[in-house]
Amino acid sequence: MASAGKPNIDDGRRGTSSPKLKGRDHAKDTLCRNVTIYGRCRYEDKGCVFNHDPSRVNDAQHPERSSSKKRFNVDSPSFTPSATPLNGSSGLKKSATISPKAANAAPFLPKGVLSRSNAATPQSQPETSTPEWSIGEIQDFVPQGFDTSHVESIHGHGNGVLSTPAYDPFVSSSTPLGASGAVTHQVQPNPYSHDPSAIGGAAFFGAHNAFQQPVQYHLYAPIGPHNQNILGYQRNIHDLFLPNSFREELQKKAAATLQTLPNSQLPTQIDYFHSLVPLDLSHQKNAAIFGYPSWVYKAQSSKDGNFYALRRLEGFRLTNEKAIRSVQNWKRVSCGSVVTVHDAFTNRSFQDSSLIFVTDYHPLSKTLAEQHLADGQGRYQGRHTSGHIPEQILWSYVTQIANALKAIHSAGLAARVIEPSKILLTGKNRIRLNACGILDVVQFDSQRPLADLQHQDLVNFGQLILTLGANSPSLMHNPTKATEHFNRSYSAQLNNSVYWLLSGMQKDQERTIDIFISGISSQLMSTFDSSLHLDDQLISDLSRELENARLVRLLTKLNFINERPEYEHDRQWSENGERYFLKLFRDYVFHQVDAQNAPVVDLGHVLTCLNKLDAGTDEKVTLISRDEQSCFIVSYKELKKAVEASFQALLKPARRI
């Protein structure tokens, strides 16, 4: 062993050197102790026979570690891929140390840059039986959907190198490369290639059996418009549920539609209609408008099952068949402000000759006379009058009736009946012209020019607005007083519009419904804006009721799974595994009892459990068997997974085994 003190290099008389093991040939595989102690041996070049390279000693002592050493070493001066030795010849032994030539090695260039440089300087490919790896032959990463024609020049086309199909991470590994036969083996998949499903590489991975959460239909998204007058922590009941007034209105309309009249004296069948229910509020006959007493009924059609309104003209005798054919023109009128006419026919089921008009049925609708007028006698006796009508509501009526007359006159027809008792109020400030086309049949023989009838519609329109604004059903008896009251109550624009309508029969200038609509365009925009706000509100209300059947679907799946009689003796299905604690969960939700062993009927508990199950929360629940010998602690997420898996097993029985 070398001396611990500092030796004198120039002293040639001292023969101290690295210890030598005479007679041992493996001294070259023994690490010199000077290297271990001092880090180097000063006698390495003066005859020391021991090994001064620790890496060679480790390779000699651990040959298995040397064989597993990575081929690509960061200490190597340049990247040189390994090739299979030809004819079984052994490859050259690589040096593990850094070569002095490493200082002159070329700088590292990315693959794309190097491939571009190769395109500029063609190189000849060595002629060997086995193709060698080339940087230019490897394609760059190109997502699916990207046009590869723009990057063909990068992959060696035109550089003198024969391009071979390279590895594509988006192609299944079972697909062989190319048809040239140069490479016959299959390329192994690259475990480091990133292939998110959003790029479209889902086909690269096989299907897996892991449980996937379904689309979260139970997560309701608040759809506008939103109320900006409340703070962030404040909530209204309308923000969570459908407004009670709207719900009650729809329920009442549904009940009125399905209403029947037992022990009725009405005919059981009129043509293809049945289940007649009278809609008139008075039993007094009134023939002032049509010339015949008229009655209105609700009936159900045997053809489509829908409900319609039947208006019967009592005692009418049809003398001209062409008169009833005029109803065909009214079938083509499609307007939201006109009650649609579907059919007209004569019938003797009421023990007389009656004319029946079939129109749409709007449940719980009122007439404008019932809503705003009360004369103290006749049909409207004792009804509450709303008094003065706000001008904005009156303008809403004007725009809707103008819309109806626009559609009717454009079809070459005339309404002829614009009366408060024949205009339906089907919703909040929502009106529709009713009983249109009846006078075309009743007064078919005494036809007037269409232009005169349309001008008369304008006059009747003005008289209607004046009657409603003055709150005077007897307008014709004292028109001056009604006009003065109307002028004092409403703006000049509304007064001028009504005066223009009342002058519809004058020949001093052209008067059409189109000219009238142009004059009230500002009010049309206001009404249109209100309809848009109502549309937004209805969409918001509908979004809250979009998935209100999700708990029913969940209950249906649970009932499909639990206690199936065909699997009663199949322990794999009913008494073991996930089906068993689904059965216990059913008892936990619906079959609880109190301290007195009485059934607990708690709808809130049922809804809470089902909502948590539908959401798949991480909250855990304790399930105990009926004999109290088994206890499970599971989460709602696991329960939801079990429900979906069991239901899919029912759809595909082969999975159950």
Curated annotation (Swiss-Prot):
Region span, Disordered: 1-29, 52-98, 115-135
Composition-biased stretches (Polar residues): 75-98, 115-132
Chain coiled-coil ranges: 522-560
UniProt region (Knob domain), positions on chain: 561-657
Residues the entry annotates as binding ATP: 311, 360-367, 421-422
Zn finger (C3H1-type) location: 27-55
Recorded domain comment: The N-terminal zinc finger binds to poly(A) RNA.
Task of the protein: Regulatory subunit of the poly(A)-nuclease (PAN) deadenylation complex, one of two cytoplasmic mRNA deadenylases involved in mRNA turnover. PAN specifically shortens poly(A) tails of RNA and the activity is stimulated by poly(A)-binding protein PAB1. PAN deadenylation is followed by rapid degradation of the shortened mRNA tails by the CCR4-NOT complex. Deadenylated mRNAs are then degraded by two alternative mechanisms, namely exosome-mediated 3'-5' exonucleolytic degradation, or deadenylation-dependent mRNA decaping and subsequent 5'-3' exonucleolytic degradation by XRN1.
PANTHER family xrefs: DEADENYLATION COMPLEX SUBUNIT PAN3 (PTHR12272), PAN2-PAN3 DEADENYLATION COMPLEX SUBUNIT PAN3 (PTHR12272:SF11)
UniProt family annotation: Belongs to the protein kinase superfamily. PAN3 family.
Stated name of the protein: PAN2-PAN3 deadenylation complex subunit PAN3
Recorded name of the encoding gene: PAN3
